[in-house]
Regions:
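Hydrophobic alpha-helical targeting segments used for export or membrane insertion
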Residues: 8-14
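Low-complexity, acidic/polar, glycine-enriched regions of mature
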Residues: 21-208
C-alpha cells in the first residue's frame, strides 16, 4: 500500500508545483501587459501648432486640455489615448486673432466647443518609437489620423514616492480644410496656409 501511496503523493506535489509555476507566470504576463493610467503634468506639457500666414509660420498653443492616457510601453496594443481640447483655450499671443479663430470663420467654438482625438490602435514601430492611429474630430468632421510619438524616457520619480515619471514627444501634420476650418473667403489657402504642424510634449506620472 505504501508503495502505491508514495508515487501518488509525489505526482500530486509535482503537479501542484507546476500549477503554481504556471499561475505565477501567467500573473506576471498579465501584469506586464496591463496598461497604466498616466496623469499629465500640466506645468511641463504643451500642445502646440504652427500654420503659415502668407509665407511666415505663426505659432500657437492650447493653454489647457483633458487627457485620458492608458499606456504600457511593453503592450501598446492594450493602450489608449483620449484627448479633448476646448477651442476657447487657443492662444497665439494675439487676442484679436484668437477670437477670430474661435469664430464662425474658422473653428466656430459656439457650435463646436471642443476638438477630440481618440486612438483606435497603438503600435510600436522602433525602439521607443510608436504610432497612435485614431479618430480626430474638429467641428463636425471626423477623420483618421496617425500620431507618431517617441517615449523620451521613463524612471522612478525622485521627488514623489511610489511614482514613475515619463516623457512623450509627438508630432503630426493635418490640413485645416479637411476639417472645414476656414469657410467663405477663409477657405482659401493663400493668406492662411492649409498645412498645420502639430507638436505635443507631455510629462506624465503614474503610481506604482
Amino acid at each position: 500500500m505504501n508503495k502505491l501511496i508514495i508515487p501518488i503523493l509525489t505526482a500530486l506535489l509535482l503537479f501542484s508545483g507546476n500549477v503554481f509555476a504556471l499561475s505565477s507566470s501567467e500573473k506576471e504576463n498579465n501584469e506586464k501587459n496591463e496598461s497604466m493610467s498616466w496623469t499629465v503634468d500640466r506645468d511641463h506639457s504643451s500642445i502646440n501648432f504652427s500654420v503659415r500666414h502668407f509665407f511666415t509660420p505663426v505659432n500657437g498653443r492650447f493653454n489647457d486640455f483633458e487627457a485620458d492616457i492608458q499606456f504600457n510601453p511593453d503592450a501598446p496594443e492594450n493602450s489608449r489615448i483620449d484627448v479633448t481640447i476646448p477651442i476657447s483655450y487657443i492662444n497665439t499671443e494675439n487676442a484679436r486673432r484668437d477670437n477670430h479663430l474661435a469664430s464662425e470663420d474658422f473653428f466656430n467654438s459656439e457650435q463646436w466647443p471642443t476638438m477630440r482625438f481618440v486612438s483606435t490602435n497603438i503600435q510600436k514601430t522602433d525602439d521607443n518609437e510608436y504610432v497612435a492611429v485614431g479618430e480626430l474630430t474638429i467641428r463636425d468632421v471626423t477623420k483618421t489620423v496617425e500620431l507618431p510619438f517617441e517615449l523620451l524616457g521613463i524612471m522612478e520619480h525622485p521627488m514623489m514616492d511610489d511614482t514613475q515619471v515619463a516623457g512623450i514627444a509627438a508630432s503630426t501634420k493635418i490640413k485645416r480644410t479637411d476639417f472645414g476650418v476656414g469657410v467663405g473667403d477663409w477657405a482659401a489657402t493663400l493668406v492662411v496656409g492649409d498645412d498645420v504642424d502639430i507638436t505635443i510634449n507631455l510629462e506624465l506620472t503614474t503610481k506604482i
